[in-house]
Regions:
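Catalytic core segments in nucleotide and nucleic-acid processing enzymes
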Residues: 134-256
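Terminal, charged accessory segments of proteins
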Residues: 1-137
Length: 256
């Protein structure tokens, strides 16, 4: 498997992005991953600011093990013959089996839990406990896309911000729509290496629905300003193509 576009962990092995901008340490890169993982895991769990800051100090495997533990109710390890029979529970057999297998498939203990509380824990286990091994790998381009999308929705509340899957569209009444493509790619200002993305932007403009296309990448030390792109074959059209740096620093600032 090619791990080039993935971040996360495979057992004790961590796949963190190369250091960039102010993300110059293992702790900051872990914190970045924990924050961005919320976009994919939002229906299962959420790492709050405190967890992001403190779990970043330990390996990602341990961080997710701690998160699973925090999602389980306090009575998770009660034996069948010791639990409070006067307390009512809605048992979820599938979730119970998942959690039992996660802790110890040979144990004689059985979990007596409230299914409403258990389901997130079981779902998280099913996402990151694969073949009896802790593992969670995510597409970094998807994570960056979701991060930019959330930022744009907060910034342009008076406009229509649409997630088109491979791109983002911003529409406003009586104004030509803007199309945005995101990519987690290290950009060097003198040699940005974005020919493929620019050619795609040219085709989008030629189709006529958009005259502005922005190519957004993570901000880095050598990529701090917009890079305008001029295209000879579009010189008689009104258009705008830009490569734009997008900062991820707010993730660190939020958790200080």
């Amino acid at each position: 498997m090619d791990f080039t576009n993935f971040v996360g962990f495979d057992g004790k092995k961590e796949l963190l992005p190369c250091g960039f901008d102010t993300f110059d340490s293992e702790v900051k890169l872990r914190q970045l991953f924990l924050h961005l993982s919320n976009f994919v895991l939002n229906s299962i769990c959420h790492f709050n600011k405190y967890e992001q800051k403190n779990f970043a100090k330990i390996p990602l495997k341990n961080a997710f093990e701690s998160k699973i533990k925090s999602l389980l109710p306090l009575h998770k390890l009660n034996r069948l013959n010791n639990f409070d029979k006067n307390r009512k529970f809605n048992l979820c057999s599938s979730s119970t089996r998942i959690i039992n297998n996660y802790y110890n498939p040979k144990t004689s203990q059985r979990l007596i839990v409230n299914s409403k509380k258990l389901i997130p824990a079981a779902k998280l286990i099913s996402h990151c406990f694969i073949n009896n091994k802790m593992q969670l790998l995510m597409d970094k381009n998807l994570l960056f896309h979701e991060f930019v999308l959330e930022k744009l929705r907060k910034l342009h509340k008076d406009k229509e911000v649409l997630d088109l899957g491979d791109s983002i569209s911003i529409k406003q009444k009586d104004v030509c729509a803007l199309k945005i493509y995101t990519s987690w790619k290290n950009i060097q200002r003198k040699d940005p290496n974005i020919e493929k993305e620019v050619n795609h932007a040219i085709n989008v403009i030629k189709e006529g629905d958009y005259n502005q296309v922005y190519l957004i990448y993570p901000k880095d030390n050598d990529f701090t300003r917009h890079i305008p792109v001029y295209v000879e074959e579009l010189k008689y059209k009104t258009y705008q193509i830009k490569a734009i740096p997008y900062s991820l620093r707010s993730i660190i600032r939020k958790n200080i």
